[in-house]
Amino acid sequence: MTRYCRGLSQRQAFLLLTVLALLFILLFVVKDPRAKDSRCQFIWKNDASAQENQQKAEPQVPIMTLSPRVHNKETTSVSSKDLKKQEREAVQGEQAEGKEKRKLETIRPAPENPQSKAEPAAKTPVSEHLDKLPRAPGALSTRKTPMATGAVPAKKKVVQATKSPASSPHPTTRRRQRLKASEFKSEPRWDFEEEYSLDMSSLQTNCSASVKIKASKSPWLQNIFLPNITLFLDSGRFTQSEWNRLEHFAPPFGFMELNQSLVQKVVTRFPPVRQQQLLLASLPTGYSKCITCAVVGNGGILNDSRVGREIDSHDYVFRLSGAVIKGYEQDVGTRTSFYGFTAFSLTQSILILGRRGFQHVPLGKDVRYLHFLEGTRDYEWLEAMFLNQTLAKTHLSWFRHRPQEAFRNALDLDRYLLLHPDFLRYMKNRFLRSKTLDTAHWRIYRPTTGALLLLTALHLCDKVSAYGFITEGHQRFSDHYYDTSWKRLIFYINHDFRLERMVWKRLHDEGIIWLYQRPQSDKAKN
């Protein structure tokens, strides 16, 4: 009995130990999964880190992220409409990034989007390295009222800019995108619109009755007339920074959409103009004189005017385009000091008026040529002129002659002057800003060649007389003084004749120029 009880106690002890061992094993099994999960988690983190490092080492591809507006608060699914919208925003964002690389940071117009119209205009500061050349201070812009009443300085106007929300492409994939006129529904106005190249070494006139002196005292002109603005473009004034700046303006007021290689090739052939004020520089040292100039337009008002001798009595005579002289000497004179033209106006004049005697430009060792560069065809004209080739493969292919033939192969580059785009834009902005620029037809507008020539004379001469320009009662006269039969003056949309007529009248009324006007009872022969 005693043995049985002792054996039972041993078995109980063994069972107790077994139970304790099982409990210990159970406790270990319960704890072990946590330790295993933690290790798996560590391994996963290492794998994720390795993948992340691998992604960083590989070339980055632009990733389109969804705007917060696309996500719904309760779900992350996106409709196809939203995806298409986001794709458009991504493309616009990439374009905006490309434009930001320009050295000149600008104000861009807002895209056609109802939401963007409600946003305020974003103004971007101008780059500090616009150009080494001095700039004209102040800024002018358009007004709701016509500028023909005097181009009074107004508050600066800039176009609206809105950047689309999208991720930026990799720096190595960015490309500088060129501006295109088709991107704008009206003329773009940049925050550096009114900055012009100035000639700080410009000669000063000693004539107390000079246009420049009168302009400085005129309430209308004193804030808009720049007597020392750069007039001419040459090899010394063509730089990369100038190209970057002027590429924001459409020709003839800049280089937008032009071929930089072509422009550089021809412009750098022209020697630097030593003195912008050519006529003042021609005066003997210490000589005081008021330089008088006659600017002769081609208007029918000159037919039977008998002012030819009066025109020739001026120190310098400016003519333009189809300047027919033979047979009209009594009406328009015979002398020519400056001849203004565009490649198109010159080729057209030779083609149409060749039988009337205008077969080449006015010739003479003292004649200077003023070329107003309208666009690509003008630079193609210059290239063909330097190569002494025809214009067969250009925008003027219909003109069968070599450009040098128009100058009778006696061209002297010292007397061939290119008008600076800054100067042309200045004349447009401050004197002849048409309402057309605020419409979809903005790209084709420019002042007439005669208007550009007259305003050029205002910046070269002391006293200016204008003949053959549009005036009140122009309906009485034919389009041109050399017309053999009466032709009505047609107001094409690419010019603003009414604006020019009002500006010439105001300049005349303020004594800035003298404008030839026929009495109301007079009529031309034709």
Curated annotation (Swiss-Prot):
According to UniProt, the tissues expressing it are described as: Submaxillary gland, mammary gland, spleen and colon.
Establish whether keyword Glycosyltransferase is in the entry: yes
Mostly located where?
A: Golgi
Any one GO cellular component localisation term in the record: Golgi membrane
What intrachain disulfides are recorded? 207-290, 293-461
What catalytic reaction does the record list? Answer: a beta-D-galactosyl-(1->3)-N-acetyl-alpha-D-galactosaminyl derivative + CMP-N-acetyl-beta-neuraminate = a beta-D-galactosyl-(1->3)-[N-acetyl-alpha-neuraminyl-(2->6)]-N-acetyl-alpha-D-galactosaminyl derivative + CMP + H(+); a 3-O-[N-acetyl-alpha-D-galactosaminyl]-L-seryl-[protein] + CMP-N-acetyl-beta-neuraminate = a 3-O-[N-acetyl-alpha-neuraminosyl-(2->6)-N-acetyl-alpha-D-galactosaminyl]-L-seryl-[protein] + CMP + H(+); a 3-O-[N-acetyl-alpha-D-galactosaminyl]-L-threonyl-[protein] + CMP-N-acetyl-beta-neuraminate = a 3-O-[N-acetyl-alpha-neuraminosyl-(2->6)-N-acetyl-alpha-D-galactosaminyl]-L-threonyl-[protein] + CMP + H(+); a 3-O-[beta-D-galactosyl-(1->3)-N-acetyl-alpha-D-galactosaminyl]-L-seryl-[protein] + CMP-N-acetyl-beta-neuraminate = a 3-O-{beta-D-galactosyl-(1->3)-[N-acetyl-alpha-neuraminosyl-(2->6)]-N-acetyl-alpha-D-galactosaminyl}-L-seryl-[protein] + CMP + H(+)
Which stretches of sequence are listed as region Disordered? 49-182
Give me any GO biological process, just one.
host-mediated perturbation of symbiont process
Where does the sequence pass through the membrane?
Answer: 13-33
* Coiled coil (UniProt feature): none
- Which family does the similarity line name? Belongs to the glycosyltransferase 29 family.
Q: What is this protein called?
A: Alpha-N-acetylgalactosaminide alpha-2,6-sialyltransferase 1
* Name of the encoding gene: St6galnac1
